[in-house]
Amino acid sequence: EKTAWLPYYYAAFCQVMAGTFSMPKDGSFGDNSAIADPYADKAEQLINKAAEMSQDNSEIFCVKKMIHSLRMMGNAMARYMTEGPKATAALEQAKALNENNPRVYILEGQDKFYTPEQFGGSKEEAKKLFEKANGIFMTSKPGSSIEPQWGRSQVTYFISQFK
């Protein structure tokens, strides 16, 4: 369907996830931009199409945040200072548009969880963010069966890491 934002949103989300899962599993932080960038570029094209159809949409800004994070993962040392602030700005916009979007808190929690403390990370803050996302999932229902609902399994996983 070429006239609705959701197909472009989901296609962009899938590109980000494919790019994330294509990254080296050895934890290396070298230049992996040849892996990450094609996925990020395609995701950006798709999410921009979604944004043309649905402006001021919290879900779209969550995916924009994910795209900037994927680019940063592609070459963290070279891109942290450029993609990091863009990712943060997209997430802040997502929260401003809908503070009850659990995906905002999942993404924020993941950042806090994986960032070393000396750079602003905090497992304690991450736990609170995952618990907030979980609370929103427990008390809200999507408007339709095709609206974004992802994130419950991530919340369950991360909360289990604190037991």
What are these regions, as identified by a protein language model?
Residues 2-3, 52-55, 99-100, 138:
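Short coil turns that delineate tetratricopeptide repeat
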Residues 14-49, 56, 63-90, 108-153:
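Short coil/linker segments at helix-helix boundaries
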Residues 1-10, 14:
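N-terminal leader/linker segments that initiate helical-solenoid repeat arrays
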Residues 59-65, 98-104:
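A structural motif
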Residues 5-8, 60, 104, 143, ...:
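TPR alpha-solenoid repeat register
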Residues 155-163:
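Eukaryotic acidic, Ser/Thr-rich intrinsically disordered low-complexity regions
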